[in-house]
Amino acid sequence: MEIELYKSRSYSGCIKSAYILFSTNLTTIFKRTWLSILVYSIPLAIMIDLSLSSRALNEADLPIPTTTLVLMSGMCIWSLAGCIWFIAVVNRILNTRTLKANLIRATVLILILLHVAGFVKIILQLVNTLVVSTFLSAKVSSGAATLTSTVIEILLDSAFFVALLPCTFSIIKYLIDPQSKISDIFGKAYRHGWRHWGFLFITLFITGIIFCLIATVLFAPFGIIVEAQISDLLGMLNGDPSGIPSNFYILLYGTTLLTSFIFAYLVIWSSFVFYYAYGSIETTEREREKSLTA
């Protein structure tokens, strides 16, 4: 595929270029990605199906069987491996490097993201615990403590969003540019992304709106089936007999698998948007460096 990456574009230009790249090469993209998406989607669908169908996973007073825990853990590892393969395959389409090189970078990226997610979760949990314990020791009402804790959590979430948004540039650069290093994700490339925070935000905002509109339509059948399953579980908790047919879970699994499979291509399109955003920012930064050294 011929791709003109390093060119100054507006956010609308990035979205348009991503759509053109995706639509004109859909057959090639499908041939190169379908297997990795299937490998990722199968365990994901099993986990969702199991989490919705197992009473042990939905009732706090029921012990979770060891076999269920082992199966869920195995599916999680399988899905994570499929996700890494999927990222590597998509990046190989864009950077034409070997699959091995892209697998290494995708694995490193996933490990970094897991650590960042864990760090953010720990910080939020610590702050929430500190706020609640402080208010309880001050004999403030539980309602006021909950409200304050919620407000602080929203503020912290917003702060993390602001701080991590430039990573949408530095991560793409790490995956695409063979000269980029791991340290650049929160180093030089991160600083470049920070200088273009507004551009990244508006690109993310508009892309997110389009993404959510399409995803809403895509997930409608899945949502209807899940709602039926949840209603049945609630009825069973109240002592009512199950009212779903015997083949319901086959339908649930098939719908989940198909939805997650198609959803992956929506993710590919959105990644193309930030691929072009990366190219635009990189072009601007190169021109900036030339003007400073001239």
Predicted regions located by residue number:
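Central hydrophobic cores of alpha-helical transmembrane segments in multi-pass inner-membrane proteins
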Residues: 12, 79-89
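Hydrophobic alpha-helical transmembrane segments of integral membrane proteins
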Residues: 70-74, 78, 108-129, 195-210, ...
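Short capping loops/turns at secondary-structure boundaries
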Residues: 83, 105, 109, 160-164
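Interfacial transmembrane-helix boundary/kink motif in multi-pass membrane proteins
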Residues: 17, 96-116, 187-192, 201
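Hydrophobic alpha-helical transmembrane segments
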Residues: 15, 30-31, 73, 107-111, ...
